[in-house]
UniProtKB/Swiss-Prot annotation:
Organism: Helicobacter acinonychis (strain Sheeba)
Domain remarks in the Swiss-Prot or TrEMBL record: The beta-hairpin motif is involved in DNA binding.
Alphabetized PROSITE patterns for the sequence: HELICASE_ATP_BIND_1, HELICASE_CTER, UVR
InterPro entries in the cross-refs: Helicase/UvrB_N (IPR006935), Helicase_ATP-bd (IPR014001), Helicase_C-like (IPR001650), P-loop_NTPase (IPR027417), UVR_dom (IPR001943), UVR_dom_sf (IPR036876), UvrB (IPR004807), UvrB_inter (IPR041471)
Pfam families: Helicase_C, ResIII, UVR, UvrB, UvrB_inter
Protein name: UvrABC system protein B
Residue ranges annotated for the Helicase ATP-binding domain, each copy included: 25-178
Similarity annotation: Belongs to the UvrB family.
Superkingdom, natural source: Bacteria
An example molecular function term from Gene Ontology annotations: ATP hydrolysis activity
Organism phylogeny: Bacteria, Pseudomonadati, Campylobacterota, Epsilonproteobacteria, Campylobacterales
Recorded name of the encoding gene: uvrB
Length: 658
């Protein structure tokens, strides 16, 4: 029986059928690695969705940045509305890890800010994986970081049935063991409240509903689900499965074992420092660890508890830590890992371990942490790539690693469903590049189309932006310090024609879906390096591939080896695309992508502004507006539009003060 129910208005076209067939056969033949080489705009995401539906396995889709993760999450939610599509990225809005700089004798405390919505989504992902098979998780590099033992997590979860005998007080203690906190005043995620013989539990992985358990003596009489906002009963249940409020929650037996294990390690390390006559390190470690042990004994947690993860999970020193992969593979279940934009993602994954180890080794050496803190780490690249699962690498420009691992299990997806060709390209002398490009931009703007320009340095980007603005062009500059929300706003403004030209350095490559862009200009294309490598050039040139008038200008004094290889790849693909179009009588059409959904949120904003301008709003009307806005705020948070959710939250606060 199929696990996944794929819904889409699209039909397969171009190279999609053969790519899906090739890769699905490879996966069903139990091959460990396979690669999809798909050009920009060829519908790789839809191909991935079809492969998931046909292979019928829980799937982890990994990407190298949060922006692309959010985009993939939105697309897969639409493709699989009846399945569990989850989102797993870092839950920190801000994170400064603890560190020590010996030459300055400077210890920097850990400082972080946890995003409540992202934490909920992470918990939702792990609970779905433990309870269901029809799960697709969209994840960032966070999937490689340590989590609690999934088997311990299963032990802590609790199935509650109507009619079963349970001591009321022991049930409350069980909730505390599961990581829930009792709070009679502020009832929100991860908390519970007890009123008479009723216990309300707000699951940590759900912000829309809470569960009410009604007792009659020591017997559970009724279980009901309530709407968290309206506080009205939605449905009654015969039983309910309640999961822990934390991915690090453990039972009392495991907790006691962990405390004993930490004490034993502390004794050994203190003995080492004493023998080395390192009194400062001895006292520092003793004081810090004993304080943490007191907190763990009293509350089950402490600040920086992740540094003791090995003791809670039962892992041996240097053993591979538990991570999201272990939740996918629970019960020896087969699963698929899709690495999107693998040419960037895999190198990023490879560099994580070394940086983490360098910082923590200093903390251990100087007595700030026990040696077991080194085992709270991301996966080493070898551990990641040799996980007991199947991998599908997806990229327009895969590296040698992906192709060597995949051997013959490689599928090309060069033909676009729209018939669009890889863009024409032209090399021009860089001596007069600013004036020459200005003339080209005017022609593009006259056609109501947009331009992307990539430079090598921040200074050149700023100066170019200044020059073109003075010459009358509507131009913006996007630099590396701009966060994801502002970046999305700039891209949206470009699509809405609030300006015509966007200049950047390394922000114009992967994942930018801009059908309005018909001209991409690459300044100083002959300066060999990361930003002008074969892969970077092909990715950048691909930004013009969603428009029928797509064209790339490369300004250079010579043609480098990277340029030559990029030209050969583009020429090969374009020839194959032209041949397919001619054979099937296809006329290339510019991709169209609606902005209606993005604009809808702005309509809500306008309504709020009008409401706030009123000097007097009747109390009944004000409560109605607040309730409506609160509902929209929750919807925005669910859809990962946190900017809009925060805006709505602030406006609700203003209304409550009227």
């Amino acid at each position: 029986m199929p696990l996944f129910d794929l819904k889409s208005p699209y039909s397969l076209a171009g190279d999609q059928p053969q790519a899906i067939d090739t890769l699905t056969k490879s996966l069903k033949n139990k091959n460990h690695y396979q690669t999809l080489v798909g050009v920009t705009g060829s519908g790789k995401t839809y191909t991935m969705a079809n492969i998931i539906a046909q292979t019928n396995k829980p799937t982890l889709i990994m990407s190298h940045n949060k922006t692309l993760c959010a985009q993939l999450y939105s697309e897969f939610k639409a493709f699989f509305p009846h399945n569990r599509v989850e989102y797993f990225i870092s839950h920190f809005d801000y994170y400064q890890p603890e560190s020590y700089i010996p030459r300055r004798d400077l210890f920097i405390e850990k400082d972080s800010s946890i995003n409540d919505d992202l934490e909920r989504l992470r918990l939702s992902a792990t609970t779905s994986l433990l309870g269901y098979d029809d799960v697709i998780v969209i994840a960032s590099v966070s999937a490689n970081y340590g989590l609690g033992n999934p088997e311990e997590y299963l032990k802590v979860m609790e199935k509650i049935k109507v009619g079963e005998k349970r001591a009321y007080k022991s049930f409350l203690l069980k909730l505390v063991e599961m990581g829930y906190s009792r709070n009679e005043v502020v009832f929100d995620r991860g908390s519970f409240r007890a009123m008479g013989e009723c216990v309300d539990i707000f699951p940590a992985y759900n912000d829309a509903e809470f569960i009410r358990i009604e007792f009659f003596g020591d017997e559970i009489e009724r279980i009901a689900v309530f709407d968290a906002l309206e506080r009205n009963e939605i449905k009654r249940l015969d039983s309910v499965m309640l999961y822990a409020a934390s991915q690090f929650a453990v039972g009392s037996e495991r907790l006691n074992l962990a405390i004993k294990s930490i004490e034993d390690e502390l004794a050994l390390r203190l003995k080492f420092f004493k023998e080395q006559d390192k009194i400062l390190e001895y006292n520092r470690l003793k004081q810090r660890t004993e304080h943490d042990l007191e907190m763990i004994s009293a509350t089950g947690v402490c600040k920086g508890i992740e540094n003791y993860a090995r003791h809670f999970t039962g892992k041996a020193p240097n053993e591979t830590p538990f991570c999201l992969f272990d939740y996918l593979g629970i019960f020896e279940r087969e699963f698929l890992v899709i690495v999107d934009e693998s040419h960037v993602s895999l190198p990023q994954f490879g560099g994580m371990y070394a940086g983490d180890m360098s910082r923590k080794s200093v903390l251990v050496e100087y007595g700030f942490r026990l040696p077991s803190a080194l085992d709270n780490r991301p996966l080493k690249f070898d551990e990641f790539i040799h996980k007991n699962c199947q991998f599908l690498f997806v990229s327009a420009t895969p590296n040698k690693l992906e192709l060597e691992l995949s051997k013959k299990n490689v599928a090309e997806q060069i033909i676009r469903p729209t018939g669009l060709l890889d863009p024409k390209f032209e090399v021009r002398d860089s001596d007069k590049q600013v004036q020459d490009l200005f003339d080209e931009i005017k022609l593009v703007v006259a056609r109501d189309e947009r331009v992307l320009i990539t430079t090598l340095t921040k200074k050149m980007a700023e100066e170019l932006c200044k020059y073109y603005a003075e010459w009358g062009l509507k131009v913006r500059y996007m630099h590396s310090e701009i966060d994801a929300i502002e970046r999305n706003h700039i891209i949206r403004s470009l699509r809405l024609k609030e300006f015509d030209v966007l200049i950047g350095i390394n922000l114009l490559r992967e994942g930018l879906d801009l059908p309005e862009v018909s001209l991409v200009a690459i300044m100083d294309a002959d300066k060999e390096g990361f930003l002008r490598s074969e892969t970077s050039l092909i990715q950048t040139m691909g930004r013009a591939a969603r428009n029928a008038n797509g064209k790339v200008l490369l300004y250079a004094k010579k043609i480098t080896q990277s340029m030559q290889k990029a030209f050969e790849t583009t020429t090969y693909r374009r020839a194959k695309q032209e041949e397919f179009n001619k054979l099937h009588n296809i006329t290339p059409k510019t991709v169209t992508r609606a902005l209606e959904e993005e604009l809808k949120l702005r309509d809500d904003e306008t309504k709020i502004a009008k409401a706030l301008k009123k000097d007097k709003i009747p109390k009944s009307e004000r409560e109605k507006i607040i309730k409506e806005l609160d509902k929209k705020m929750r919807e925005c948070a669910k859809n990962l539009d946190f900017e809009e959710a925060m805006h709505l939250r602030d406006e609700i606060a203003k209304l409550r003060t009227l």
